Amino acid sequence: MAQCTPKSFDLTGKVALITGASYGIGMAIAKAMAANGATIVFNDIKQELVDKGLASYAEVGIKAHGYVCDVTDEDAVNAMVAKITEEVGHINILVNNAGIIKRIPMTEMSAAQFRQVIDVDLNAPFIVAKAIIPDMIAQGGGKIINICSMMSELGRETVSAYAAAKGGLKMLTKNIASEYGAYNIQCNGIGPGYIATDRKSTRLNSSH
């Protein structure tokens, strides 16, 4: 993955929550933010993934804070945000990174599978942002970054649910920016292409 030049920007004193950042793109974003002074907070759905993430951060000298939380569960998210605020501090930066993809032809995909992708990739960013925005308003502003994917712009075979979710996330990003810009909350989306994360590299290697 691309490396961030230390002190490319100053995040000293800022608390950044990156969802699903126990590995992959989320971890790379978190490491870049930490290199520029941010305090890193992340979540994952299983304790073993949180523990693995904490160990990976510790290996490079980052004291991260990890929480077990299902970001599709509004009550759990509200509880996590309250706990982070109490234990770490007010969240200044949110990166909605957690996501899943199911590569299944549309006619073979069940409605339940479609809903699961929409729930994680679209509903969850709404839930987490909704939980954090009131405190950002009270603190005088904040930053929200949504990982939208190039699939928010393109259609591809076998990813109908993922593309639909990411397209929706792109529009949610625009609406958050429009609705809360007056409160000094900036919301932007990033549409990365194919990134060689550990999981994707494993899948590529196994296909040869």
Regions found by a protein language model. Give the residues of each.
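Conserved glycine-rich cofactor-binding loop
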Residues: 15, 22-23
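The beta1-alpha1 cofactor-binding region of Rossmann-like NAD(H)/NADP(H)-dependent oxidoreductases
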Residues: 47-48, 68-80, 111
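Active-site loop immediately N-terminal to the catalytic Tyr-X3-Lys motif
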Residues: 104-107, 154-160, 182-183
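Substrate-binding pocket helix/loop in short-chain dehydrogenase/reductase
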Residues: 105-106, 113-118, 200
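Active-site helix of classical SDR
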Residues: 129, 165, 173
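Alpha-helical segment proximal to the catalytic Tyr-Lys
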Residues: 134, 178-182
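Residue(s) in the substrate-gating loop at a strand-loop-helix junction
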Residues: 149
